[in-house]
Amino acid sequence: MAWLDPLNAYPLPADFASKAEAYSTLLLTYNKTHNISGAKTTQAVEENILDSLYPLLFMEAWPNRCIDIGSGAGFPGIPLALALPQMEVHLFEPIAKKSAFLHLVKSELGLTNVVVKTERIEATEAFPCALICSRAVTNTKALLSLAKAFITPTTCALLYKGSRANEELEGFSNYTLFERNQRRYVLVKELM
């Protein structure tokens, strides 16, 4: 699939393309009725998948457990779960129709490494987590405050931000910023 060419440097699982296509079809179908995403075309879904997976090209290592806060239609959590089947991905989405979609995707694609939680991150029982991901939820300080019970001395945050990322990072010292188009990917280490 040509749209995956930007990820050629990363060895995706053999079933990735077929599962990504199935995810795209499910999202476009569900979205017609339930309006859970701004992605209304195959091309838009593919771009959201690429956006979700771009960190594969710069992350040095991936942990065994990740939480995605405010998963919405599944970005970035579902694409990361497809690309990294060895990683347990917990999707936190409090809005019922979006969470129902995430449950559907998990079931239809047989994603045994995905756990869907229909609740806010601060309302759930915390567990140690090596990576916190989030895209378009809230500002960095507020997000990390919401997730504080999950943070250990080795927890990192991978945040998908827009053009104002630098403003949100004031006061943080141990982070790396990567850019692709209008997206700023922020990897924050040593959260404690």
Please give the residue ranges for each predicted region.
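Short capping/connector residues at structural and topological boundaries
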Residues: 41-42, 50, 83, 126, ...
